[in-house]
Amino acid sequence: WYYLHLFAAEQPDFNWSNADVHEHFRTFLRFWVERGIEGFRVDVAHGLVKAEGLPDDELGPDRWNIAGSPDEDTAHEKLPDVGPAFNQPGVHDIYREWRRVLDEVGQDILLVAEAWVPTEADAAQYVRADEMSQAFNFPFLGAGWDADALRRVIDVSLSEYGAVGAPATWVLSNHDVVRHASRLAYPADMDTDPGIGPKDPQPDAELGLARARAATLFMLGLPGSAYLYQGEELGLPEHTTMEDEARQDPLWERTNHLIPGRDGCRVPLPWTRDGASYGYNATGRTWLPQPEGWGEYSPQAQEGCDDSTLTLYRRSIALRRKLGLGRGSVEWLDSEPGVLLLRNGTTAIVLNTTEQPVTIEGVGRTLITSWRRSETDESDAANTVEAAGAVVVPPNGACWLDDSAGGTDGGDPR
C-alpha cells in the first residue's frame, strides 16, 4: 500500500472525502480560536481536494511553467488549466465549512490563502464573502522589475478582488522564493525559481537593495493589504553561496542536488552585529548557516540610522497608516515608459524602473523616498523638491509626494 503525498514523503495528504477529516479540522479551528488565535495562514490552500479517481498528472506540479500561459499556443493547450491535484472546485466547499465554524465563534478570524493558482481570477475565488479573507498575490511577486507587468497585475488584481468584495493584497517575498533584495538584481530573463547556488551568477547586492527598497515603498503605497516576509525589513539578501552540505530543503535532495532549493531565503535572522549566531540564540548554532557579515543587516547595526532599510520600513508603514493608503484607491497618472505614477487619495506614488532619472512636475513636498543620501550627491536635486515644484526620482527609486493640490504630472525623463 502507499499514501499520497504531493510534497515530502513525511507529509501525507489528508483524505478530504473522509468525514472524520472534516470533523478533525473543525475541532482544530475551535481549539485555537478559544486560545486567542486571530487568524490562520493556509499552506497550499489550493491543494486539499484531488480530482475524483486520483488520475495521473501528465505534466506534474510544474505544469504551468511547462505549459506556458493559458493565452499562449502551446503543445499542452488542451490540458486543463490546473492539474488533478490542485485548484479543484471541491476545495471551496471546505473553506465555506471553515468560515461557518469561525463565524459561529462570533469573532472576525482571518483566513489567508497561500494558493499558487494560474490567474488573479482564480485566486479571487478563494476570497469570496463566504470563504477566506485574503489570498497572497503571487502574480505581483512574479511581476519583477517591469513597470508594464506591475501595472497589469495591479489593475487586474483590483478588478478581480473587488468583484468579490475582497481587498487586494501585495507581497514581494516569502519562504519559497529568492528574497527580492537579490531577485530584483537579476535581468528579467534570469530564472531564480529553483534557488541560487554558489555556481550561479551572483546578484549585484547594491542594485538589488536599491530596487527592493523602491519596490517595497511602491507596494506600501497601494490600497489593500501588504504582506512582509521576516527579514526583508532589514534588507536581507538571499544566502547565495551556501555550501552544498548545509542544504536541507527536500527539493535539493529530491532533485539529486540539481536544484539549490529554498534554504537561501530561510537563513536565521541576525539580531546583533557580532556573536556566533549574530544574536539569534544563546548556543550559537543554527540549522542553516548564516553568511559572513550577516550582522551588518541586524537591527542593532541599523537602529538610529536615517538611511537604513529598517528605518525606511518603520517610517513608510507609519505614514501609510497616517495617510490611509490601505483604504484608498488607484488613479493612474500619465508618465514616461518604465515609470509608474499613481494617485492614492492625496498622495502621489512614483516608481522609476529605468536607468535614467525622471522629473515629476507639479508636486508638493516629498513625503518619503526609497533612495539613501549615500546613493546621491548631497547637492543632487533628487534629494530635495525643486523650487519650480518638481522632484527628480533617480534610477531604481520610488517616492511618495504630497498631491493634495492635484497637480502631479509625469513630466520628462532626464
Stretch-by-stretch model annotation:
Residues 1-363, 367, 371-414:
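Active-site and adjacent substrate-binding regions of carbohydrate-active enzymes
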